[in-house]
Amino acid sequence: MLNHIGQIPAAAAFKFSNKDALVFEGRTFSFNEINDLVERAAGGLSDLGIVQGDTVTLYAANSWEWIVSYYAIARLGAVINPVNTMLTPSEIEYVVKDCGAKAIIASPEKVAAI
């Protein structure tokens, strides 16, 4: 039984292992690959000091990296703060400050806005 959404990739990898989990722009990922990427990303966030209850802003366009980041944040028990990529820089600033984000994950094309 799963206790939170951060456990979904590991449970799916256990059940479906090398079956296709995600296809994005011609690239295919197995359930094992997604879980491994989530583990690595969660480890990186943990190394940065992110712990359960911290808020992490996710500011990125739709991509496989967004999915991995989403589950990595959840895996740590941190709060996911997804931000609409259509917001203006001042709106993004407000959202990030208002939620008390400890970290921001942004795609390269969005970094300039923050």
For every predicted segment, state its role:
Residues 5:
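Conserved donor sugar-nucleotide recognition element shared by glycan-biosynthetic enzymes
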Residues 9, 68-69, 114:
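Aromatic/hydrophobic pocket-lining residues that form π-stacking "cages" and hydrophobic walls in ligand
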Residues 47-48, 75-114:
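Structural core segment of the AMP-binding/adenylate-forming
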Residues 2, 18-63, 67-71, 88-93:
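Conserved AMP-binding/adenylate-forming core of the ANL superfamily
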Residues 16, 23, 77-81:
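A generic, residue-level signal for flexible/boundary positions that often mark functional hotspots
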Residues 11-17:
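Flexible acidic/glycine-rich loop/turn elements at helix↔coil and beta-strand↔loop transitions
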